[in-house]
Amino acid sequence: MPTPLRPRLPLMSSDTGFAVRSAAFYAALFMLNGIVLPFFPVWLKAKGVEAALIGIILAAPPVVRIIAIPLITANADRRDAVRGTLIAASALCVAGYALVASVEGGLVILVAYALTSFAITPIMPLLETYTLRGLGARGRAYGPVRLWGSVAFIVGLFGAGFAADVMAARELIWLIVAASAIALVMAVNLAPLSAGDTTPAAPSPAPRRRLLRDRAFLVVAVSAGLTQASHAVYYGFSALDWSKAGLDGTAIAALWALGVIAEIILFAFLNRLPAVLTPELLLIVGGAGAVLRWIVMAFDPPVALLPLLQLLHALSFGMTYLGALFFTHRHAPPGQAATAQGYLAIVLGVTAACATAASGWLYGAFGDKAYAAMALVAIVGCGYGAVAHRAARRVSGDAA
């Protein structure tokens, strides 16, 4: 079993500095996300940006990440400067959001936000690389560190919601600027990686190209990408569906929060999971959870069943994400940890973008039955997880 699943809890050890500082940055980063996701579009509308252009602006991060992530993560690997790159990207993020806040006109905002996205999108794969490397060297658990990101996401979501009730919509951007500044402070506060934490730098682009031809890595990335992409209808249309079913905004927010709470519980007890749950098996369990979740959602379940379905988020999202994350961390060649996490992030982003684009048409044509299509996507993702598991067992048997 990979080391990150089984070690002692980092916050129960005397060696808390690295874990606490990493958790603080996760919290700041996810609090920022909890504000940006629901309220950046509200600000754009208040600025007078047309709906069609808002959609284009919001599409900037998944488009920009295809270029930004491999360039920046590879440079961080080459210079062995993951922490320094995190600080630089966080500083550019603050400057970028301040620029977005100060410009006028939809097209100018689009350009400013695209430039900001160039700094934002590599932060998560860089942070995962930094955290897994440092915690692994210290024999500490990943879950109790990462869960603070999910907690902070809920805090940011509800906190910004309360602020939006008392602030003018045109001022919401300054909440985003302030949250990004807090993230920068937490990035600067990250503990430096010691010599024992680092890995040799990659000597040339050739090994990176080999990673893209690595069948095991690609199978895992596609498995996780498809299962994560199967959430597209849920992310885009669940609130609309539940509103039609008579739920008010508070109830809808509570259901969304319940899914994140399930994820938090998974992270909290991650080191107590059975050792038999390899990364490949996590992909299978996560995919199976997604299949069950979307099949039931396709048949217009009663409101009383929705909380139970939301708890499946721990499987459909949480286990899938962890399986891909841990596999990539273990499988990355020396000097390519950030690059490998970057490639994984690109696959997840591209598959999610494609599914999101298709989800609008599916929901418009079939309504709730669009979830059945998402179940099919998850079945394929689960199948790729089974292929990865079978290959891992074969390799293990050969090694024995």
Residues covered by each model-derived region:
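Symmetry-related core transmembrane helices of the 12-TM Major Facilitator Superfamily/SLC fold
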Residues: 172-189, 370-388
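Cytoplasmic helix-loop-helix junction between adjacent transmembrane helices
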Residues: 113-148
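Structural signature of the two symmetry-related core transmembrane helices
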Residues: 84-98, 281-296
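Juxtamembrane intracellular "pre-TM" segments in multi-pass secondary transporters
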Residues: 5-16, 190-226
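A late C-terminal transmembrane helix in Major Facilitator Superfamily
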Residues: 338-366
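Helix-to-loop junctions at the C-terminal end of transmembrane segments
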Residues: 66-81, 164-165, 265-278, 363-364
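Hydrophobic core of transmembrane alpha-helices in multi-pass small-molecule transporters
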Residues: 27, 96-97, 106-124, 225, ...
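Helix-loop boundary and gating motifs at the non-cytosolic
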Residues: 13-62, 217-255
